[in-house]
């Protein structure tokens, strides 16, 4: 019998690739998204092309009422929770610069930190020994990432604390931190040829990453072979940012 997986932000890009790799292994995968049309379509396509069942749940991870519905929908032990929702936030013009700045930062924190915190708290009682929580971070947390980078840095700090909190119960928690990944909404909008060449040039393998690169690492972290890996931020960027 397959595992039960929850992937937030599963309608496209990295989240969808993560859902696909688990569904291909025969797992039962719940994917969430804010827009009913796109999340339902993604679930149907993934379900039709993989052995595992894929179920769509319309859910905004920053809204407690939506998360209560997600818990009711899942209603069983969760083996793997992947917090993949987040990304850039479209700012709202405002006459007051400070008010605009406040709203922008609040939105980035909500989308990239609070959603993961609330989703994990909502599903906490469905997690158990040998469950794992994987949150998608960003290379922006290590660089001049502005509000987005600051939010992803906060996500990593929260995840490390979560690992310490839940470790005694046999639950692992890690962050997977991608660099430049093609085929995602994050990079598609304003990507110029010059910017593409610059980002690829920063890597050691001279290629952009793919959503599948991230998904395969997430899949490994959810495997029995990764039970002693917890409290970590693991980078997937082709060497564009290195650690020691």
Task: Name each model-derived stretch.
Residues 219, 230-244:
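Short C-terminal tail/terminal secondary-structure segment
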Residues 72, 87-106, 147, 188-191:
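Conserved mid-core segment of classical short-chain dehydrogenase/reductases
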Residues 100-104, 132-168, 180-181:
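Catalytic loop of short-chain dehydrogenase/reductase
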Residues 168, 181-203, 243-244:
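A glycine/serine/threonine-rich, flexible loop-to-helix segment
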Residues 203-214, 225:
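A conserved structural motif in NAD(P)-dependent oxidoreductases
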Residues 11-13, 35:
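Conserved glycine-rich cofactor-binding loop
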Residues 167, 172, 229-231:
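Short, small/polar-rich loop/turn modules that mediate ligand/substrate recognition or access, typified
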